[in-house]
């Protein structure tokens, strides 16, 4: 088998894995989707996301999102999923080893549910993993007067992040 044939087999398997996850994603939560992150395709500015792809996951800049409505990213040049949160819903996980950097919510997109985790620098500037203790939390760890909404799980490096 040539290297080109092997690449083609791997490409087909990757596509099949991505389509399988996409079909299951609407019934899955962020933790389950992010657990299969290696199957999630990268967001593309050149894509055309149709109504058939609503609910499909995409990843961009280290975050995972689901597509909320049909659209063509090229119509918003220079914008990425983090900028278009009415179109892309930010997902979170409860798995500390898969924690993503904290991002602000946009409406209900990206609110942290109970036990979801993120990475965020501690008071000394060292990246830590934090578990959310408050449902629908929009505040980052260490925010004045809401510190009790987060539990520090330790350095992110201890989780391989």
Tell where the protein language model's regions lie, with residue ranges.
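Tryptophan-rich substrate-binding surfaces of secreted polymer-degrading and adhesive proteins
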Residues: 2-161
